[in-house]
Regions:
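General structural signal for secondary-structure boundaries
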Residues: 26-30, 48-53, 94-97, 187
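Post-HExxH zinc-binding segment in Zn-dependent metallohydrolases
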Residues: 5-45
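Acidic/His metal-coordination segments adjacent to aromatic residues that form catalytic metal sites
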Residues: 1-2, 6, 59-65, 121-130
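Generic detector of intrinsically disordered, low-complexity, polar/charged segments
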Residues: 4, 8, 23, 40-43, ...
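Short, solvent-exposed segments of well-ordered alpha helices
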Residues: 4, 8-11, 71, 128, ...
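All-alpha helical catalytic cores of prenyl diphosphate-utilizing isoprenoid enzymes
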Residues: 41-63, 67-80, 85, 112-114
Length: 219
């Protein structure tokens, strides 16, 4: 019997961390709680109030480092890496030429000049350990997270009220019931449809970004 491909993908795995990092961790409600907690430990630390803290956590600006990127720019960092991977795997780009190709593409996407490789092609561990093709799972994770969080909010009225108290138990319970308990039983698209009642689509994630940052920047 041939071994079947495992069902759930790394794009689903990444969606779980992205939900907690972004939709929950960068929410106005959770950052309000976090600001108070930090102030109780550190006293004054140069940030005026909860609203300023929230806006700083969600500040949109171009930067060199993927792991420090805001939610708006993050997927551009992934696209850059993915396009270079395609070129390398397709033997259209040699490894010694990667730094120059990276810097050129970064300039095109972010309009900034990379001055050192630690801010560019050498900033991630993935390629050095042979993890080619992993980067797209982060964007897939973002898109899956958008689908799941949209449904979570509809299923749990007042979900964000708990975040303001540092309580994420309603979110973890919903994910346990709708995602975790199924393990690798379903293919990603089937799992998303089972959890949300809808086919996978980028729309919930795009709507989330539009609503959130339109509010922050009053646009």
């Amino acid at each position: 019997m041939p071994k079947e491909t495992p069902g759930v993908s790394l794009g689903i795995h990444e969606s779980q961390s992205r939900i907690f990092e972004n939709q929950i961790g960068r929410s106005r409600q959770f950052t309000r709680w976090l600001f108070k907690k930090m102030k109780s430990y550190f006293g004054e630390f140069g940030i005026r109030d909860e609203e300023e803290f929230y806006r700083l956590v969600n500040k949109v600006e171009t930067g060199f480092i993927r792991t420090e990127a805001d939610e708006v720019h993050y997927n551009l960092h992934i696209m850059l890496r993915f396009e270079l991977e395609v070129e390398v795997i397709g033997k259209n780009l040699e490894v010694p030429d990667l730094p120059e190709a990276w810097n050129s593409k970064f300039k095109e996407y972010f309009d900034r000049d990379v001055e050192k490789s630690s801010d560019g092609v050498l900033q991630d561990v993935h390629w050095s350990i042979g993890a080619f093709g992993y980067f797209p799972t982060y964007t897939l994770g973002n898109l899956n997270a958008g689908c799941l969080f949209e449904k979570m909010q509809k299923d749990i009225p007042g979900l964000a009220d708990g975040f303001e108290k540092g309580d994420v138990s309603l979110a973890t319970t919903w994910l346990a019931e709708n995602i975790h308990q199924h393990g690798s039983l379903y293919e990603p698209g089937d799992l998303i449809k089972k959890a949300t009642g809808k086919d996978f689509t980028p729309e919930p994630f795009l709507n989330y970004l539009d609503e959130k940052f339109s509010d922050i920047y009053e646009i």
